[in-house]
């Protein structure tokens, strides 16, 4: 264990070192492993815990991909998976390039965004991290990179069934730079304004959850509704994918929240406990509410949505509240997000994956309730917030102003996120070849066929025999008819089920 103690200057989970950057093990340069064993400055148990939590967070990205793909129609499944995985790659590059430095460089003192001191991960090898003096900065940087990647995976689901992939990749890089990194700096950088004000946000209620929710809302507004959204009731094509995605998300979330204690300690254990309780209760409340007041059915989709909402709400408060409070937070969140989806339907907002209703609303609720339920003894479980350094807590600890701080923080994050994201999307859509939305014909045949040319599901009985259909000048398959035994194109766009398939054109009409 390092002999240097961390002293919190605010009540976030990020701790600031008592030593200046030049007094770190490497003298602020990152260190030279050829001259000295830099591992000796750090506790192996704490470092191992964060290294283990990093791949746990990574598995959340395919979890999001499966969750979204199951909610979509079959002809748009693969595009949603590709958006999540391509977004993961763009996030890694951006985070390495300058994202980490803009969010966490401690020499940038504006309070709103960092500088380029750690451009391309320079000077990050073995310095004390902004998260804790117990782990090296390189470990911290990689762990935090997972948070950026997960946020992008959540946000990109807003393009479901009508968004183009290419423009989204460019938007991802820009959005991380001008939206995510500044918000992360506000709350997790020791120089950030929200950090200094004493806002409680344990693992990303603002940057990750509210950030992805309001960004998705802006994307939904810019894209507009899907064609036939009003006339048709779209149904998820694979409930099994939704359950699989939920399972991967829940599994990864334990590392996401547990690792945010930045050490192998009791606070990490409490964060995992609270995460499980909030997710479980929210899932139960959601499905029971639907059964009693709406459908009289035990909805699998409803259960999975409730679980995810509870996990989202636990993100900002898992390291600040007691298990009893987590039960209440899970129940409140399950009801609020359930009502939010119903309200979205009445307003005819086509947020196909319910990103705002689940992540935006649950992130808002969880972060706000931190100001009510946060208690000093939970934060003290990491061994840092003890004695004179203990937090003041929330209303239960008679710290009345904390709710106001939490509300101001959420409103600032939501407003900044929505406005800047909308501006990015609006400008991008006006650039030639970077239009956000696919053509109406492409939307009809499916984003998988238009943007990828591959299919998530391709059955033997639905063989694609190209001699029975042709590409129109618009670049989409034309429907054919049989006249006197001869196949003739009609000039109409083939419906998804008629792009098929059999060697006998008379069998056209099967559905995908």
From Swiss-Prot:
Cellular component aspect of the GO annotation: plasma membrane
Membrane topology, Cytoplasmic segments: 69-77, 159-167, 223-238, 289-300, 344-354, 428-512
Membrane association type: Multi-pass membrane protein
Any GO molecular function: ammonium channel activity
Extracellular-side positions: 1-47, 99-137, 189-201, 260-267, 322, 376-406
Coiled coil location: none
Keywords per UniProt: Ammonia transport, Membrane, Transmembrane, Transmembrane helix, Transport
Localisation: Membrane
Residue ranges of the TM segments: 48-68, 78-98, 138-158, 168-188, 202-222, 239-259, 268-288, 301-321, 323-343, 355-375, 407-427
The family this protein is said to belong to: Belongs to the ammonia transporter channel (TC 1.A.11.2) family.
Protein name: Ammonium transporter 2
Organism: Schizosaccharomyces pombe (strain 972 / ATCC 24843) (Fission yeast)
């Amino acid at each position: 264990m390092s002999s240097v103690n961390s002293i919190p200057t605010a009540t976030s989970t990020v701790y600031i070192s008592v030593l200046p950057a030049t007094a770190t093990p490497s003298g602020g340069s990152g260190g030279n492993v050829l001259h000295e064993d830099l591992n000796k400055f750090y506790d192996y148990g704490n470092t191992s815990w964060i290294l283990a939590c990093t791949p746990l967070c990574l598995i959340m990205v395919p979890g999001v991909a499966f969750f979204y793909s199951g909610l979509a129609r079959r002809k748009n499944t693969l595009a949603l998976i590709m958006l999540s995985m391509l977004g993961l790659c763009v996030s890694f590059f951006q985070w390495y390039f300058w994202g980490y430095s803009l969010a966490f460089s401690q020499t940038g003192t504006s309070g709103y965004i960092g500088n380029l001191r750690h451009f391309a991960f320079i000077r990050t090898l073995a310095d004390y991290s902004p998260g804790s003096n117990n782990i090296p900065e390189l470990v911290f940087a990689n762990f935090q990179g997972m948070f950026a990647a997960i946020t992008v995976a959540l946000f990109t689901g807003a393009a479901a069934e009508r968004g183009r992939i290419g423009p989204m990749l460019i938007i991802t890089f820009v959005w991380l730079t001008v939206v995510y990194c500044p918000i992360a700096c506000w709350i997790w950088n020791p120089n950030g304004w929200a950090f200094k004000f004493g806002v409680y946000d344990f693992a990303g209620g603002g940057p990750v959850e509210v950030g992805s929710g309001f960004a998705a809302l802006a994307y939904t507004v810019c894209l507009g509704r899907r064609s036939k959204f009003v006339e048709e009731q779209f149904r998820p094509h694979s409930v099994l994918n939704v359950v699989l995605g939920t399972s991967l998300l829940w599994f990864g979330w334990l590392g996401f929240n547990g690792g945010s204690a930045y050490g192998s300690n009791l606070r990490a254990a409490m964060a995992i406990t609270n995460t499980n309780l909030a997710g479980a209760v929210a899932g139960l409340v959601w499905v029971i509410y639907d059964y009693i007041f709406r459908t009289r059915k035990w909805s699998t989709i409803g259960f999975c949505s409730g679980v995810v909402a509870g996990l989202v709400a636990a993100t900002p408060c898992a390291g600040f509240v007691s298990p009893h409070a987590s039960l209440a937070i899970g129940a409140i969140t399950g009801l609020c997000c359930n009502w939010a989806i119903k309200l979205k339907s009445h307003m005819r907002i086509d947020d196909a994956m319910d990103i705002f209703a689940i992540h935006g609303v649950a992130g808002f609720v969880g972060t706000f309730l931190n100001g009510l339920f946060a208690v000093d003894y939970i934060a003290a479980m990491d061994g840092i917030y003890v004695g004179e350094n203990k937090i003041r807590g929330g209303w239960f600890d008679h710290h009345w102003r904390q709710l106001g701080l939490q509300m101001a923080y959420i409103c600032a994050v939501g407003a900044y996120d929505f406005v800047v994201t909308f501006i990015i999307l609006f400008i991008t859509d006006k650039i030639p070849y970077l239009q956000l939305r696919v053509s109406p014909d492409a939307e009809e045949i499916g984003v998988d066929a238009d943007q990828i040319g591959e299919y998530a599901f391709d059955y033997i009985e639905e063989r694609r025999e190209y001699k029975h259909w042709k590409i129109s000048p618009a670049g989409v398959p034309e429907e054919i008819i049989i006249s006197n035994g001869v196949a003739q194109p009609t000039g109409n766009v083939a419906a998804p089920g008629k792009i098929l398939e059999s060697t006998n054109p008379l069998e056209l009409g099967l559905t995908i």
